């Protein structure tokens, strides 16, 4: 990899991200938004200028419905993301292994999802062409992550590993999202070989109409500082997608949800009787 490709001497974890105007920072492609229920785009992965060694941020989270207020809830990051004890996961297994059908069903309410967040630059978006050239955060599940991992560490002998975050040599990623049982299906997404001038990082300028004008295809002769300044100014703050520790309000909320379904708080202390005990079986005997 060239010196320009990794920019290690310019990336600075201690440098604060610039204050950005409120605008679209996350790419959320879905078959639901596409003609014929097939969303197609070409993207390239972009290193996180503040910490390139952590250009993929992984975490578990859970959407906890509020049992006291129907149709409300909040997403809570799982402490297991950083190897800490997780009351949400503990409650899931407590209910799952209870042997009671109602509790087993309620365990689903504490099921976690695993997401990987990273930066991408849109090369071509057939559904939202105004995004072409823009750098956004893309949160993906295990299917896309495994394709990235295989690109970096091939499972077949003889295939050379490639770094998709290499701003010059990283391959383009074709996104083709179809529908499968009402969900997004990523089976047809893949890395492809296209001309390097098309797949490399592009320096762009935002126009008055909201589109992005391509200024320069980054190459070995590009000015390092110019490239770094572009990434710093145009990349959303990926740090916002890291695991977020629980504040006191989150602790109280999680405790209240756990107490509703188990009769005890996350710490194991007895809770007040729930308002609708018929919604769950008692766990005091478990």
Label each region the model flagged:
Residues 1-165, 244-252, 256-259, 286:
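OB-fold ssDNA-binding interfaces and closely related basic DNA-contact patches used
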Residues 280-286:
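Terminal short linear interaction segments
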Residues 124-280:
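Compact mixed alphabeta submodule
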């Amino acid at each position: 990899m060239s010196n320009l490709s990794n920019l290690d001497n310019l990336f600075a974890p201690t440098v604060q991200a610039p204050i950005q105007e409120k605008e679209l920072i996350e790419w959320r492609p879905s078959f639901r938004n596409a003609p014929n229920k097939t969303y197609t785009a070409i993207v390239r992965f972009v290193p996180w200028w503040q910490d390139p060694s952590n250009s993929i941020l992984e975490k578990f989270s859970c959407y906890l419905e509020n049992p006291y207020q129907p149709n409300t809830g909040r997403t809570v990051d799982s402490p297991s993301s950083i190897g800490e004890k997780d009351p949400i996961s503990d409650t899931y297994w407590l209910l799952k292994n209870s042997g009671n059908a109602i509790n087993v069903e309620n365990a689903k309410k504490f099921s976690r999802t695993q997401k990987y967040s990273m930066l991408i630059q849109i090369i071509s978006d057939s559904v939202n062409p105004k995004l072409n050239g823009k750098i956004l955060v893309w949160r993906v599940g295990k299917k896309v992550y495994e394709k990235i991992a295989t690109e970096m560490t091939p499972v077949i002998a003889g295939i050379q590993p490639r770094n998709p975050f290499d701003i010059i040599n990283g391959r383009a990623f074709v996104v083709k999202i179809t529908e499968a049982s009402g969900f997004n299906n990523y089976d047809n997404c893949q890395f492809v070989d296209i001309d390097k001038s098309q797949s490399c990082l592009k320096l762009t300028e935002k126009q008055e109409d909201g589109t992005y004008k391509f200024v320069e295809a980054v190459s070995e002769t590009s000015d390092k500082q110019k490239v770094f300044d572009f990434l710093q100014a145009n990349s959303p703050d990926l740090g916002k997608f890291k695991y977020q520790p629980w504040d006191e309000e989150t602790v109280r909320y999680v405790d209240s949800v756990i107490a509703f379904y188990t009769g005890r708080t996350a710490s194991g202390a007895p809770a007040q009787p729930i308002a609708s005990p018929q919604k769950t079986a008692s766990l005091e005997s478990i």
